[in-house]
Amino acid sequence: ELKRLLELKNNSIQRAECEIRKSLYAEKEQIQKIFCDGRKFSGTVGIYMSKGDTHRGGRSVAKVELDNGTILYYKPHSLDKNIKYQELYNYLCRKTGISCRTVQYLSHDSYGWEEKIENIPCKNESEVEHYYFRMGIHLFLGYALGATDLHGENIIAHGEYPVIIDMETYPGYLKQQSEKDGSSVEEKINKSTEIKLANSVIHTGMLPVLTWGRGNRGVLISAMGTEEKIKTPFKLPVVKDDKTSDIHIEYEPVEMQIKECIVRLNDQVINAADYTECIIRGFCRAYMVTMADKKVEVMLSGFFDGRSRVVLRHTQQYAMYLMASFHPDYMKSRECRKALLNVIHKEGESSFMKEIHDYEIDSLLEMDIPCFEIDANSRSVYDGNGGEHKEYLPCTPYESWRMHMKQMSYSDMECQCDYIRLSMEMLKASDGKKKMFPIRIKGYDTDKERKIYSQIRKIVHRICSRAIIREQSVGWTGLQFWDNGHW
């Protein structure tokens, strides 16, 4: 099996490099004009493969360094969505009175070229504030389009400009309630509450949330940038005593650090929690522009004219399965690896889910990370081999997005701002104690009794406005505190 996988990897790299070189020289003049400021190149210094997950026969992002000093990225999919997003983002920036940075792209149907964006520090306090204001605009667009993959590896802090470098999951699928969700009223209201949170700013991936487990086992991950190293709550294979005769593999938690999204003021790392209100200002300004300007909704609807990637299982989970299958005990044959990967199947699974799990296993056997797509006007989900799995979704992504847009309001905006504040608070140093979160309620009466009565009414109104009602039942979202100070 090792021999087969080595041959497979070697062939996929050769095929990809040939494809990249062919595209590079066929578009030489355009690339020189768009990415090189007109400077000519005659060849490459290096092509560095596998700068991301591999899909569909080993295809992945590649870093290309030209002999004129220019570095750019080759991506094995169209970048039309990136261009469309940039136009929308630029429009909102102009409407909210802030500048934006234009990223250079060259897009085709099945691949595209993108300029290299570097992580650079802010020069002054004003730039830091502008950075987080722009993050608020990005957060709103992620919320409006149901994005779920805006984690730290997909956002680069380029001075005062946050730049999103992966748009494959735009637009996402915004969950909607189904009549099949729960047999009892209690189960249905719980499902409604779950859906409300799933469609909120929390699930964009940009805000700090507990990942890879709940409670004390969870790890705080976000795109807001932190200097702290992340320690995985699960074990991964690690090479020990390399370059010696005692080289071996041990399984242990791994420390990792997402560096590209870290914001710095000169050499000082910035704590994003100190700029929560800047994020909220950007979010609210973009939200209010969208409610007032119909052109924004038209531009948003333009994302629903094709397919987008949908995440059915975390990439880290696939990576764990893949790494486990490389253990010497399972590398004896393809059948041995498949026997291990069959753990993906679940007892009593439907024939529908069996087909999806079969595809996941087949992809992992070929060292690919499984990928799925949804079409804006279909209820099907499509796998990376082109297979269609019908009626996976209760309604089409476009229909779901229309329902999402209809519920947008000032009340919803305030609710999302509450989620932002609660989430960002976790970036502050934790003392392990439960925290109180004061809610800003406008209004003040000099008469003490009238003031108390007025504030009570506002609190009651707030509680009622946050209620999730279904049939004859009502529910609310709330916080569950853990010993590590997170919630």
Model-predicted segments: where are they?
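C-terminal catalytic region of ATP-dependent kinase domains
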Residues: E1-R21, Y25, Y161-R457
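Short amphipathic alpha-helical segments and their helix-coil junctions
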Residues: N119, T477-Q480
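Solvent-exposed loop and edge beta-strand segments that line ligand/cofactor-binding
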Residues: L479-W487
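Hydrophobic residue at the +6 position relative to the catalytic HRD Asp in the kinase catalytic loop
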Residues: E153-I155
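Conserved ATP-binding subdomain of kinase catalytic cores across diverse folds
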Residues: E1-A147, Y161-V163
